[in-house]
């Protein structure tokens, strides 16, 4: 169908629209007829592909389930055995959150006996605070409830803290108790709107009421008190307020201070003085830091997830002391290198795993470490030459960083940690025998997700047990162990206790029953204490736990245990350090090893003509050669030896030259037994010594010549110039 221009000119706009609709409908019908049969064919092929994929996936899944079925059944049998033992010995399953929340802390205040807070004992504080004191922003003292209940209150949830810490020291904002919707209040808090309200409320207090939060929010409207310097009653109870204590800069404040050591702080103006380092601190750098590190390919040479999943990054590792770990472990290369090196060399190092190593060295190891044969041998040799070779502390820091960045930590999930809680708390130690507790701990290890993680945990506990044993041996030989910095099981438990779960998303602090900041801090402290106690118990009783692991055949509970026969065997690598050339200790001072010795052939000549010196030049040369050999043998071997010229050394005077000659002759005569004749020397004429009379005469002449030189010296001190005439007149009188 075509359009006629005459009809287009004579027609209307409605006719044109109708014609357009007809053309589009006809084109659509032709397209449907054209692609009708191919679409059916494509649809049939897609359906066939989908059916094939589904059947292949289902078959592979069934095969995988069939292969992993025996491992799952063994894990379930270990778990059922654990519950049977718990029921037999009346061990109740205690959750870590429940156990920590039930602990009653003894709350003490530093100002409990102060007379200022006697009034607060009668008044009842709000429900969110049980310490009977409030701590406002910018003041370190405790303020009583009776005077500041209407003006100030501490935040009652974590959501309030972010805004509470950003406010200035002058503006005082009150956070009321949250509603019953939840302990943490709102899920999100708009800090920008609240900061805008804080800025506009001081100029127009009436506008603050209109800009309050809606009724759906859990927070009640904020109340802004008057200025900090407006009312005296507001700071009546504060010990650091300018109303009670004078200013620090005035002279009269020294006399009016209650004590010499009292120095009150000035009231903050609310203005933060910026420094140069503030402009280089960006908040987006630290956002999601642990997640970015876990997926960063520059950490440990490869992504840390690939180090535990890729078989090319794993090796079959045997612990240096086989009785401390299972026979064959499956470890990443870098972890195996660190464990092997520390187990052989660093058991006695004080503060190991506690002291942080060198940052550049640790970064070089974590960034440039690859699978063999490259690690520490090729790529990083030039780097270590510039920044220094790793020490024991650096390698221990690399091992600790690996565990910190490992997703899920050592246990993967908190259910395994909850199984170990009733075994190492104080109330259950009396009830459960040691043998049963070790067996139950070994059964808990069977619930780990992979054999690689199980190998990491076993090798780490074996290393920590070796360090604790070596520490005990060294401290037994010490008289005073109070100042010892060696690592005991308690210290190692404090370090590795929080690393049981790592930086996993299932953090136990999120399940705190209360949103109060003080309660959360106590919760985290108690949680770390329980975790440290668990690690400490595992370190102390690790040999017994290992016996139970081997007897129960725990390694066969993991489906990836077969990879130990497919990966490469561990080969230890040592940093390639270019040590300087060392000269052997027992080296004969010959002319071949020391070519410069031939220049030290003669002593300085003496201009003394006597009857005994004729024909003795050969003997003097022989004595000189023998003396130089003895001196060289007694000294440390050095690559370079200074030479002495053959020319005669000019003497200061003839008397001094004679005295030196006499001293040499006296030394030879005084100890004739110690002096041995040099071998392989043709002694035709014996050496004749000087007489004792000559020695005394030469010494007397030497003294006289020294006195003459002193008297004839032109040096005159300033004292003699000023007071010499006075002293001479005094002698004459």
From Swiss-Prot:
Site (Arginine finger): 354
An example Gene Ontology CC term for this record: non-growing cell tip
Keyword Nucleus in record: no
GO biological process: regulation of establishment or maintenance of cell polarity; small GTPase-mediated signal transduction
UniProt xrefs under Pfam families: RhoGAP
UniProt biased composition (Low complexity): 179-195
Annotated GO MF terms: GTPase activator activity; small GTPase binding
Region (Disordered): 116-135, 174-256, 692-713
Listed Polar residues bias regions: 116-125, 196-218, 225-240
Keywords carried by this UniProt record: GTPase activation, Phosphoprotein
Official protein name in the record: Probable Rho-GTPase-activating protein 6
Gene source species: Schizosaccharomyces pombe (strain 972 / ATCC 24843) (Fission yeast)
């Amino acid at each position: 169908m075509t359009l006629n221009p005459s009809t287009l000119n004579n027609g209307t706009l409605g006719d044109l629209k109708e014609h357009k609709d007809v053309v589009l409908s006809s084109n659509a019908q032709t397209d449907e007829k054209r692609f009708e049969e191919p679409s059916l064919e494509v649809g049939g092929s897609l359906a066939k592909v989908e059916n094939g994929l589904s059947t292949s996936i289902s078959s592979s899944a069934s095969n995988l389930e069939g292969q992993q079925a025996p491992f799952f059944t063994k894990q379930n049998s270990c778990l059922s055995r654990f519950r049977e033992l718990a029921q037999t010995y009346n061990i109740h399953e205690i959750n870590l959150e429940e156990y920590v929340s039930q602990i009653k802390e003894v709350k003490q205040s530093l100002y409990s006996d102060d007379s200022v807070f006697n009034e607060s004992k009668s008044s009842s504080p709000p429900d969110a605070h049980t310490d009977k004191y409030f701590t406002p922003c910018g003041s370190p003292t405790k303020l009583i409830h009776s005077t500041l209940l209407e003006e100030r209150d501490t935040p009652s949830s974590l959501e309030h803290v972010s805004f509470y810490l950003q406010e200035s020291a002058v503006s005082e904002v009150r956070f009321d108790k949250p509603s019953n919707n939840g302990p943490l209040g709102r899920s999100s808090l708009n800090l920008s709107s609240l900061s805008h309200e804080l800025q506009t409320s001081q100029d127009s207090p009436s506008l603050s009421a209109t800009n309050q939060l809606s009724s759906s929010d859990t927070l009640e409207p904020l109340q802004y008190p008057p200025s900090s310097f407006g009312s005296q009653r507001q700071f009546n109870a504060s010990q650091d307020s300018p109303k009670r204590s004078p200013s620090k800069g005035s002279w009269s404040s020294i006399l009016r201070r209650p004590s010499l050591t009292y120095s009150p702080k000035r009231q903050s103006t609310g203005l933060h003085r910026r420094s140069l380092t503030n402009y280089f601190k960006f908040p987006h750098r630290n956002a999601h830091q642990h997640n970015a590190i876990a997926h960063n390919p520059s950490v440990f040479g490869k992504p840390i997830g690939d180090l535990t999943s890729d078989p090319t990054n794993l090796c079959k590792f045997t612990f240096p002391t086989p009785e401390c770990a299972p026979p064959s472990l499956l470890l990443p290369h870098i972890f195996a290198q660190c464990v092997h090196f520390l187990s052989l060399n660093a058991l006695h190092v004080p503060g190991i795993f506690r002291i942080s190593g060198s940052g550049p060295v640790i970064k070089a190891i974590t960034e440039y470490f690859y699978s063999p044969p490259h690690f520490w041998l090729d790529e990083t040799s030039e780097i270590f030459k510039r920044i220094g070779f790793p020490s024991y502390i650096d390698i221990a820091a690399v091992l600790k960083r690996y565990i910190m960045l490992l997703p899920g930590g050592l246990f993967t999930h908190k259910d395994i940690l909850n199984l170990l809680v009733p075994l190492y708390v104080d109330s259950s130690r009396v009830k459960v025998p040691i043998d049963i507790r070790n067996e139950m701990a070994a059964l808990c290890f069977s619930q780990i997700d992979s054999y690689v993680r199980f190998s990491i945990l076993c090798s780490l506990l074996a290393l920590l047990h070796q360090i604790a044993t070596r520490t005990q041996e060294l401290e037994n030989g010490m008289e005073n162990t109070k100042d010892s910095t060696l690592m005991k099981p308690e210290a190692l438990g404090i370090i590795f206790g929080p690393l049981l779960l790592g930086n996993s998303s299932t953090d136990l602090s999120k399940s705190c029953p209360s949103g109060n900041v003080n309660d959360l801090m106590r919760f985290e402290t108690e949680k770390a204490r329980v975790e440290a106690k668990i690690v400490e118990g595992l370190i102390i009783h690790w040999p017994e736990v290992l016996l139970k692991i081997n007897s129960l055949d725990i390694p066969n509970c993991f489906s990836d245990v077969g990879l130990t026969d497919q990966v490469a065997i561990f080969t230890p690598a040592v940093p390639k350090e270019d040590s300087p050339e060392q000269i052997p200790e027992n080296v004969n001072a010959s002319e071949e090893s020391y070519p410069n010795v031939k220049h030290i052939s003669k002593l300085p000549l003496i201009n003394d003509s006597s009857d005994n010196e004729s024909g003795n030049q050969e003997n003097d040369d022989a004595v000189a050669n023998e003396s130089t050999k003895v001196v060289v043998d007694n000294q440390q071997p050095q690559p370079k030896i200074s030479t002495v010229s053959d020319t005669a050394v000019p003497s200061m005077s003839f008397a001094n030259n004679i005295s030196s000659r006499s001293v040499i002759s006296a030394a030879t005569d005084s100890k004739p037994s110690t002096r041995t004749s040099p071998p392989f020397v043709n002694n035709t004429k014996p050496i004749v010594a000087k007489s004792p009379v000559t020695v005394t005469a030469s010494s007397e002449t030497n003294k006289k010549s020294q006195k003459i030189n002193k008297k004839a010296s032109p040096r005159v001190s300033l004292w003699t110039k000023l007071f010499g005439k006075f002293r001479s007149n005094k002698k004459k009188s």
